[in-house]
């Protein structure tokens, strides 16, 4: 858990800026959390918030449950989008370029491997895709454990290279089905409350998707977290959970994207509760399951734009708000320094 000995001092710094108490709203909470994180292990409170090297990690993986027609897109699209990311043509590339966010793609196990020596591609393949969880376990326990280790290693390496804020994105056809199954199985919420429209399926397809997800969830009762990850998890989701754990271990904040990334964050908090203190939440997505996981994590997202793209786009769009929080904390005058009396 975050050490709180400097919390009052940081709050005093915020309260004594030239503004009414609380006038910057949620930005003040962001500044408090960032300053508190950056004070961990230090001898004094952080008087300056550093956000100089943001890192976006985009985890890609394919899902055997796609065979059940739970998405309107075929699994081949995952590879095509990975190539698009590497070529700089996706929405996430546009937003990362706008805000000077470094983007790295991680192949956790997509159906069609990418033949590329791009420097921003990391290969951590656990297979060509998960098994179809409608009928069998999606992953083995060994794959779950390796995925967690992979995520921890990747995040730790980026932090060692200077990253001071992490953001995670994802790509994988049918990964909303895996995320919904994980959320239902781990939280006990009804399947039909966790399943959403994903890529834009119609009512008939949604009903079918709920039934498919329920088949996997039905095998999960009474299982451990790792066993549930094996039953209905995804390579990219579990790898991402490991990355969340490493971020907390290395005292680095993570700006959390939408539904799938939030489910990975929830998994990480079940495995390591201290992860929660390092999470800031970018946005509220259109996926109905996202409302559930945000509630479970007691999270108040910064944006509500009706996004349902994934890729880390919501996190990239919210990043300037973190910069704004740091800017006022670092540079806004205090009442005393400005000679303002109240």
Swiss-Prot record:
One of its GO terms (molecular function) is nicotinate-nucleotide-dimethylbenzimidazole phosphoribosyltransferase activity. Keywords: Cobalamin biosynthesis, Glycosyltransferase, Transferase. It is an enzyme of class 2 (transferase). GO terms for biological process: cobalamin biosynthetic process. Pathway: Nucleoside biosynthesis; alpha-ribazole biosynthesis; alpha-ribazole from 5,6-dimethylbenzimidazole: step 1/2. It catalyses: 5,6-dimethylbenzimidazole + nicotinate beta-D-ribonucleotide = alpha-ribazole 5'-phosphate + nicotinate + H(+). The active site is at 311 (proton acceptor). Its EC number is 2.4.2.21. Catalyzes the synthesis of alpha-ribazole-5'-phosphate from nicotinate mononucleotide (NAMN) and 5,6-dimethylbenzimidazole (DMB). Belongs to the CobT family. NCBIfam families: cobT_DBIPRT (TIGR03160), PRK00105.1 (NF000996). This is Nicotinate-nucleotide--dimethylbenzimidazole phosphoribosyltransferase.
């Amino acid at each position: 858990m975050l050490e709180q000995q400097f919390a009052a001092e940081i709050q005093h710094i915020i309260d004594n800026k030239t503004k009414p108490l609380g006038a910057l709203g949620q930005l003040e909470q962001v500044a408090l959390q960032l300053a508190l994180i950056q004070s961990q292990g230090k001898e004094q409170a952080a008087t300056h918030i550093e956000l100089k090297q943001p890192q976006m990690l985009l985890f890609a993986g394919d899902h055997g449950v796609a065979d059940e027609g739970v998405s309107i897109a075929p699994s081949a699209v995952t590879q095509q989008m990975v190539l698009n990311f590497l070529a700089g043509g996706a929405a996430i590339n546009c937003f990362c370029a706008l805000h000077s966010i470094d983007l790295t793609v991680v192949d956790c196990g997509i159906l069609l491997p990418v033949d590329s020596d791009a420097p921003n591609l990391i290969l951590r393949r656990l297979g060509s895709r998960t098994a179809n969880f409608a009928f069998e376990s999606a992953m083995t326990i060994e794959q779950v454990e390796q995925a967690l280790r992979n995520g921890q290693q990747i995040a730790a390496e980026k932090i060692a290279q200077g990253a001071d804020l992490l953001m995670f994105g994802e790509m994988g056809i049918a990964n909303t089905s895996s995320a919904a199954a994980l959320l239902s199985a781990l939280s006990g919420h009804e399947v039909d409350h966790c399943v959403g429209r994903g890529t834009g399926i119609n009512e008939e397809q949604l009903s079918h998707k709920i039934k498919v997800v329920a088949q996997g969830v039905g095998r999960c009762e009474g299982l451990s977290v790792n066993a549930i990850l094996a039953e209905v998890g995804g390579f990219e989701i579990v790898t991402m959970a490991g990355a969340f754990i490493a971020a907390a271990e290395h005292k680095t904040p993570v700006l959390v994207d939408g539904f799938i990334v939030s489910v990975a964050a929830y998994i990480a908090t079940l495995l390591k509760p201290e992860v929660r203190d390092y999470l800031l939440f970018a946005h509220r997505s259109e996926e109905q399951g996202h409302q559930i996981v945000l509630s479970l994590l007691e999270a108040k997202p910064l944006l509500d734009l009706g996004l349902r793209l994934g890729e880390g786009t919501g996190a990239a769009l919210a990043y300037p708000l973190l910069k704004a929080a740091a800017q006022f904390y670092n540079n806004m005058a205090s009442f005393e320094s400005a000679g303002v009396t109240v």
